């Protein structure tokens, strides 16, 4: 056994606990508090197990789960970029690449390569698995927006055009889930006045 390798990997396991401290802007289903990145990742991973039959293409579910669990770890260093923060989005890629290099350099080389490869695959949208993972990354907050009574949308004065722009590629991974979200999560919040319909 290579004890140095094990110790280095266990230290990384301790480090990624910090994902639990990265706060998102989506309320939990009860609307009482905001979720964190780790809760978001866990929720999507379980959703991947349950909803993979609705992917546009056949997917390797373990790969989808892996992509979902890894893709936001960089936010430990880069922080969460709010979906509607146009200024933050301008530097998001640069900050996240630097964070990925810093984060994964703390692993043994082969594991660092594996984790970085998963992150890159998610970012590039090039595989069926990454496209479906992106759909779930968008579907999950829409589900919580609706479950929490549209609280974050209402508080932020969000407009339908913003939500549609944010989800412009959601159907690439699952047309079925995107159509479901529009009908069951988005439209009800428009009807209740929590999301402003600014599209004629």
Regions found by a protein language model. Name each.
Residues 1-200:
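Alpha-helical, largely C-terminal catalytic domains
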């Amino acid at each position: 056994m290579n004890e140095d390798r094990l110790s280095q990997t266990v230290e990384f396991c301790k480090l990624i606990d910090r994902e639990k401290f990265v706060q998102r802007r989506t309320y939990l289903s009860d609307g009482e508090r905001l979720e964190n990145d780790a809760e978001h990742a866990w929720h999507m991973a379980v959703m991947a197990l349950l909803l993979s039959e609705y992917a546009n293409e056949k997917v390797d579910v373990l790969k989808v789960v892996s992509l979902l669990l890894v893709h936001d770890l960089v936010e430990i260093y880069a922080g969460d970029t709010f979906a509607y923060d146009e200024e933050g989005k301008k530097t998001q890629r640069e900050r996240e690449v630097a964070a990925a290099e810093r984060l994964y350099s703390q692993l043994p080389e082969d594991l660092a390569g594996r984790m970085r490869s998963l992150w890159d695959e998610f970012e590039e949208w090039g595989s069926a698995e990454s496209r479906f993972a992106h759909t779930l990354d968008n579907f999950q907050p829409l589900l919580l927006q609706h479950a929490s009574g549209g609280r974050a949308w209402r508080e932020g004065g969000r407009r339908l055009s913003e939500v549609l722009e944010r989800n412009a590629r959601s159907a690439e991974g699952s047309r079925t889930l995107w159509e479901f979200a529009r009908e069951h999560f988005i439209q009800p919040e428009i009807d209740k006045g929590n999301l402003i319909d600014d599209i004629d």
